[in-house]
Amino acid sequence: MIYVISITVFASIIFILVGLLLLVEAKVVKKDDCVIVVNDDEGKGLKIQGGTTLLSALSENKIFLPAACGGGGSCGTCKCVVEEGGRGLLPTELAHLTRREKKRNVRLACQLKVKEDLKIRLPEEIFNVKKYNAIVVSNENVATFIKDLILKLDPGAKLEFKAGAFIQIDVPEYELSFSEFRCRVAERFRPEWDAFNLWGLHSLTEEPIFRAYSLANPPSEKSILHFTVRIATPPPGVSEAPPGVGSSYIFNLKPGDRVTLSGPYGEFFVKETDKEMCFVGGGAGMAPLRSHILHQLNTLKTKRKISFWYGARSKKELFFEEEFKGLEKEFENFEFHVALSHPKPEDDWKGMTGFIHQCLQDNCLSKHDDPTEIEYYLCGPPMMIDAIDDMLDSLGVEPKMIAYDKF
């Protein structure tokens, strides 16, 4: 009897708490129309239903803020200034805002629920961001977990962007099993998929989302868009973790499929100076670095000294190698270097071995007249970026000389 009474009391408390939460939401979250005034344009206030996020409200009105994480609050890119309304900062925003930004009332649009009328300020370049429709031209494996995705925009459409920019690909509701990838993963890469037992994984999203991907093509290619996308699989030994929703969707795309995207966005741009440039990358971080290098050499015909240092695990994980070797032969101011951290016996590798940051230091920077005068552009896995950053810091390179994009 005591057990039954305890359960009843506990359940009653839970129901009361849920009821209170619903009551608070009903009182606090404004469900009526709210008006968002952008950049003091009172005549074009946006009427939206209260309760949605500012990011979603703007997107519904064809104003597309960058949100590399898809609106989850982890990237901190969907910033805007809230001049009126919005109430206080949320704990989820604090880590992404500097002290100066907090004083200026900068907010993360993905975290701010619209509960009242707002006045906000956005950068003018945001209004150049547009939606595009495209068709998949090809989607081939170039490494074990990386696809080389090529899209063609609909006739007449052109994407004006700067090298280093990214776009956001819309991901619709879907559900799929990784067993469907068997016919889409190149045969030479399947042993690794077998070893990690990936065919049994499952991916789904019950609502439309979007994910950010860097462009791998130079700005001169305005209607054919190129991406290198790594599928996000669970860490070894954590099979219960879900695979990446966006990358799983992209991995499953096939020629003829339709894709919707928005852009361009980005801040990972080359500085307009005469300084030497050093590009360092790994994995899918190839994308923006390829865009930069092709633009600098083929379009701008720059005379600046450029080197590209790319790290991979084994020879099977190298791609676009012949393209960069060709550029090295064509342009005397360009050097291409590759290092393998774990070459296989069958690779018969005669090149550099080890992690790319150490190879860069041992084979270049330790012999350079002044490494602090080089501009560094880094793109790849966070651990790689952190290792390079620490190494450059030990050499006295100032943060202003380093730009990076963590994948």
Go through each PLM region and give its residues.
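Cysteine-centered iron-sulfur cluster-binding motifs in ferredoxin-type domains/subunits
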Residues: 66-76, 109-113
